[in-house]
Amino acid sequence: MFLPKFNPIRSFSPILRAKTLLRYQNRMYLSTEIRKAIEDAIESAPVVLFMKGTPEFPKCGFSRATIGLLGNQGVDPAKFAAYNVLEDPELREGIKEFSEWPTIPQLYVNKEFIGGCDVITSMARSGELADLLEEAQALVPEEEEETKDR
């Protein structure tokens, strides 16, 4: 008795196949210009956040929460850059494709994609975010923190 040959494309439901095809189809839209701009942005600072709005005026609750978490962790403003994806539709779609992450905000530390608001919140609760930011030397030096508190 012969077993039928396994065909991975046929074994998935039509909906999953359509989603997979759409994901690959969408990848064609990331131009080299946008890819280069994103790479340059990620390299601009040790901590980089792609968000809706600005740190002073976030335009969504998730961006506001992420900015709050980074502030509570003590991220040094001199080692932080934020990019407002609402100013550029190509950047907004491009960063999602670049990271293969569907939502904004998106956090990068030392050029490595960390995650969105849910991941950052979880990492903050567990202490992983503080450790990561400390390793990246992205926190305000303790002497400056003591001066601020006075």
From Swiss-Prot:
What's the main place this protein lives? Answer: mitochondrion
Name the InterPro entries for this protein: Glutaredoxin, GRX_PICOT-like, Monothiol_GRX-rel, Thioredoxin-like_sf
Does this entry carry the keyword Nucleotide-binding? no
Residues bound to [2Fe-2S] cluster are 60
Q: List positions binding glutathione.
A: 52, 92-96, 104, 117-118
Q: Can you name a GO cellular component term?
A: mitochondrial matrix
Q: Where in the cell is it found?
A: Mitochondrion matrix
Q: List, for all copies, the residue spans of the domain called Glutaredoxin.
A: 35-140
One function term, GO molecular function aspect = disulfide oxidoreductase activity
Q: Which UniProt keywords apply?
A: 2Fe-2S, Iron, Iron-sulfur, Metal-binding, Mitochondrion, Redox-active center, Transit peptide
Q: Which CDD domains match?
A: GRX_PICOT_like
Q: What does this protein do?
A: Monothiol glutaredoxin involved in mitochondrial iron-sulfur (Fe/S) cluster transfer. Receives 2Fe/2S clusters from scaffold protein ISU1 and mediates their transfer to apoproteins, to the 4Fe/FS cluster biosynthesis machinery, or export from mitochondrion.
Record's subunit section: Homodimer. Interacts with SSQ1. Interacts with BOL1.
Q: What else is known?
A: Present with 6260 molecules/cell in log phase SD medium.
Family, according to the entry, reads as follows: Belongs to the glutaredoxin family. Monothiol subfamily.
Please report the name of this protein according to its UniProt entry.
Monothiol glutaredoxin-5, mitochondrial
Source organism per UniProt: Saccharomyces cerevisiae (strain ATCC 204508 / S288c) (Baker's yeast)
